[in-house]
From Swiss-Prot:
Chemical reaction(s) catalysed: heme b + (2E,6E)-farnesyl diphosphate + H2O = Fe(II)-heme o + diphosphate
Protein name: Protoheme IX farnesyltransferase
GO process terms (BP): heme O biosynthetic process
Disulfide bonds: none
Organism lineage string: Bacteria, Pseudomonadati, Pseudomonadota, Alphaproteobacteria, Hyphomicrobiales
Length: 316
């Protein structure tokens, strides 16, 4: 497969300059939907970490992590502008739509990256800042520039970038990394392949058109479906680990088990999906459920933590 070259969108005729692009256009560069998940899981890591952090410092930490995530999104859109212009799912993004020039997106992303890392280091903790810097580098250089266009395992390895936020939030409070923060990392890391391969199944045409070697395009639907089930099972097991390791209650464990079984159930629906199915309804259902699953798991961890704090505080 031939991957489209980045040069095909540079120097767009009639594209607006910095002063003509709206604030909304630049906000779209930050990938706000992805950022919301990053912010939520980082917040969970910060709250669940043992110790105390000043509320203002905590707010600053989450803001810096959000800006860093947005910077990664902007740099990803800068590099992927060529394939975004071809794929129906991404054709309306600011750069291929002609609202922002590629070089402006690059400058915007680099500026936000430096700002988020430096402020997080100065105001909160340099280990957390280092993890944020590594996350930005990993997502942009390792995943976007290398893995995404070179291997069907791009999501498996590249998924690490999306799994770091709770670990960064944890480090903001404790100044370190622990088994608990690694478990939070693993939940997202193992969740990522099933989530994105479900999307890749019903967007095979888009990925095939631009030569991105996603699992369904390179290895076929059958292999992808089996891999989805494997990662769904691994995700379900990792979701229960907080209880197994003693930092979440049996109530959380029961909830995580039910959600995990739901994840596996939807993945089995994908496995049973006929080869060449054009509608891909089971894949779309799994994709939607996977998003709900991750938000539900981290929400349950926060609720479980709040209940434990109330109980230990003698309020009930």
């Amino acid at each position: 497969m031939t991957v489209i070259g980045n040069h095909e969108v540079v120097g767009m005729e009639g594209a607006p300059r910095l002063s003509e692009a709206s604030a909304r256009d630049y906000f779209e560069l930050l990938k706000p939907r992805v950022m919301s998940l990053v912010v939520f899981t980082a917040f969970a890591g910060l709250v669940l970490a043992p110790g105390h952090i000043n509320p203002f410092i905590g707010f600053t930490a989450i803001l810096c992590i959000a800006i860093g995530a947005g910077a990664s999104g902007a740099l990803n859109m800068w590099y992927d502008a060529d394939i975004d212009a071809v794929m129906s799912r991404t054709a309306k993004r600011p750069i291929p739509a002609g609202k922002i020039l590629p070089q402006e997106a690059l400058a915007f992303g680099l500026t936000l990256s430096a700002f988020s890392v430096i402020i997080l280091g100065l105001a909160v903790h340099w280990l957390a800042a280092g993890l944020l810097a590594f996350t930005i580098f990993f997502y942009v250089a390792i995943y976007t520039m290398w893995l995404k266009r070179s291997t069907p395992q791009n999501i498996v390895i590249g998924g690490a970038a999306g799994a770091f936020p709770p670990m960064i939030g944890w480090a903001c409070v404790t100044g370190g990394v622990s088994v608990e923060s690694i478990v939070l990392f693993l939940i997202i890391f193992l969740w990522t392949p099933a989530h994105f391969w479900a999307l890749a199944l019903f967007k095979m045409g888009d990925y095939g058109a631009v030569g991105v070697p996603m699992m369904p395009n390179v290895c076929g639907e059958a292999t992808t479906k089996r891999q989805i089930v494997i990662y769904a099972v691994l995700t379900a097991v990792s979701g229960v680990c907080p209880t197994l390791l003693g930092f979440a209650s049996l109530g959380y464990g029961a909830f995580a088990t039910v959600m995990g079984l739901g994840f596996v159930w939807y993945s089995l629906g994908v496995l049973r999906m006929p080869e060449g199915d054009k509608r891909m309804v089971p894949a779309k259902k799994l994709f939607a459920f996977s998003i709900a699953y991750l938000f539900a798991i981290f929400s349950a961890l926060l609720v479980d933590y709040a209940i434990a704090r109330i109980w230990l505080g003698g309020i009930v």
